[in-house]
């Protein structure tokens, strides 16, 4: 099968591309490299540099490949950047997603959309949060990703496509950048590998649902094989505090360095954990990598850089 992966030079997208290549599929990666890296692009993938907000450039990259499946992961993924420049956030995450929807429609290809989980539901959501809880985004990023969901599901209904929305938990693992709006796992790991004090925002009690990137990539393959439309949380359903993440990474590093405390960023949530019951029951997906194991593996990767 021919699979288009937008954002495939990025952290999660490159692992999704790997997963489909390992299955024997042909993969085209479209990425503008604004945050992704050519080093992340798998050797056997075809690469086209294009901006998803430029419909003409996107079509020129995609049409000769004629994908049978589209995995859309290209995004403006920084909460802070979305607050600083909500117009750009909207262009990438809303207009860009619309352009990808149209490219998929022209080829009759179902689209699997990488949505946000935690930034969508808000601090007052029940935990673990089910998919049918009313989204209450707390940032322009959360709002734009929710708008992207609406286009993906509307195109599924309009054009009878088996489009899938995957609301991802906090993904961590090898290849995650520690620069810009990075996850704490990447930031902590890089600082510990250099023997530096990692920055701990807030008091460390804020919680997230940490999912290893290999499990996230497997969810895309599972959704593709199911060949049915749907909306699913992709998560562990387990809340882990930032302080616990730091503790596990310090154990992996054999380090005792104390963190540098810093205030929470604007728009940052106190807690987020998603309910994965639906995807487990309907598609048979469940995470395989426990947090402690995944953090050890992730730190080992950063230690080699």
What spans do the regions from the language model cover?
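N-terminal Rossmann-like NAD(P)+-binding domain of SDR-like oxidoreductases, especially those catalyzing
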Residues: 1-171, 214
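Hydrophobic aliphatic residues
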Residues: 74, 104, 180, 192-193, ...
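A conserved pocket-lining segment of Rossmann-fold NAD(P)-dependent short-chain dehydrogenase/reductase
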Residues: 82, 132-136, 161-177, 187-211, ...
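Hydrophobic alpha-helix immediately C-terminal to the catalytic Tyr-X-X-X-Lys motif of short-chain
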Residues: 147, 151, 155, 188, ...
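C-terminal substrate-binding subdomain of Rossmann-fold SDR/epimerase-dehydratase oxidoreductases
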Residues: 190-305
């Amino acid at each position: 099968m021919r699979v288009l992966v937008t954002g495939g030079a990025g952290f999660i997208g490159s692992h999704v591309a790997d997963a489909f290549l390992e299955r024997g599929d042909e993969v085209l990666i479209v990425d503008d490299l604004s945050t992704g890296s050519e080093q992340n692009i798998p050797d056997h993938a075809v690469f086209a540099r294009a901006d998803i907000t430029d419909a003409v450039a996107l079509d020129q990259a995609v049409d000769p490949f004629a994908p049978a499946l589209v995995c859309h992961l290209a995004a403006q993924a920084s909460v802070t950047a979305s607050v600083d420049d909500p117009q750009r956030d909207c262009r990438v995450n809303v207009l860009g997603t619309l352009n990808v929807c149209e490219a998929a429609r022209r080829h009759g290809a179902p689209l699997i959309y990488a949505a946000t989980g935690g930034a969508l539901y808000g601090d007052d959501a029940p935990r673990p949060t089910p998919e049918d809880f009313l989204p209450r985004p707390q940032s322009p990023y959360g709002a734009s990703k929710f708008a992207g969901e609406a286009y993906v599901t509307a195109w599924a209904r309009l054009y009878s496509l088996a489009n899938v929305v995957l609301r991802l938990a906090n993904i961590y693992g090898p290849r995650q950048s520690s620069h810009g709006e990075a996850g704490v796992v990447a930031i902590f790991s890089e600082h510990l590998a250099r023997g530096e004090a990692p920055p701990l925002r807030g008091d460390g009690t804020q919680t997230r649902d940490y999912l290893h990137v290999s499990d996230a990539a497997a969810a895309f393959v599972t959704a593709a094989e199911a060949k049915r439309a749907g909306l699913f949380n992709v998560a562990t359903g387990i809340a882990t505090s930032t302080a616990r993440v730091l503790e596990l990474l310090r154990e992996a590093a054999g380090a005792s360095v104390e963190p540098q405390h810093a205030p929470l960023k604007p728009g940052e949530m106190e807690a987020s954990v998603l309910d994965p019951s639906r995807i487990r029951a309907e598609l048979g997906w469940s995470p395989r990598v426990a947090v402690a194991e995944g953090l050890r593996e992730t730190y080992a990767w950063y230690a080699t850089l």
